[in-house]
Regions:
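Conserved short S/T/G-enriched processing/targeting/catalytic segments and their helical context
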Residues: 1-102, 106
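Non-catalytic alpha-helical scaffolds and adjoining flexible linkers that form interface surfaces
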Residues: 101-124
């Protein structure tokens, strides 16, 4: 089970998550479930993840790739936190759809993401 918590205070945000991942019996390891994106001076965004590790790693890598390749939609070009959540949700949804087609394989690509942060001028 993964724990990700976000609390909004008058002074800002408090974010915390566990770092244990379980790939089966006796296959427990640690992996950060919190990724910080400070790629532009006017924003600080944090993505916390739970669920299938391959799915969540893909989403984080795709976000980084879109920034590196200066895609039209990336974390630096979106003006609102809600637009950023939609963008990340689209990446996640497309990945889940791609691997959910063959349910007989037993692979469960599900993941849950929690986005927190602030874009200058907007609320946290």
């Amino acid at each position: 089970m993964t724990y990700c918590v976000a609390i909004t205070l008058d002074a800002g945000l408090v974010l915390t998550s566990d770092s244990r991942t379980n790939a089966g019996v006796d296959q427990v390891s640690t992996y950060s479930k919190m990724t910080r994106f400070e790629t532009h001076a006017d924003r600080c965004l944090v993505l916390m993840s739970a669920g299938n590790l391959a799915t969540t790693q893909f989403v984080v890598e795709q976000i980084h790739r879109d920034i590196r390749e200066s895609q039209a939609r990336n974390l630096n070009t979106l003006s609102y936190l809600s637009d950023t959540a939609d963008y990340i949700g689209e990446i996640l949804s497309s990945r889940i759809r791609r691997y959910s087609e063959n349910e007989a394989s037993g692979f469960a690509p599900e993941a849950t993401l929690l986005l927190a942060g602030q874009i200058q001028g907007g609320p946290p």
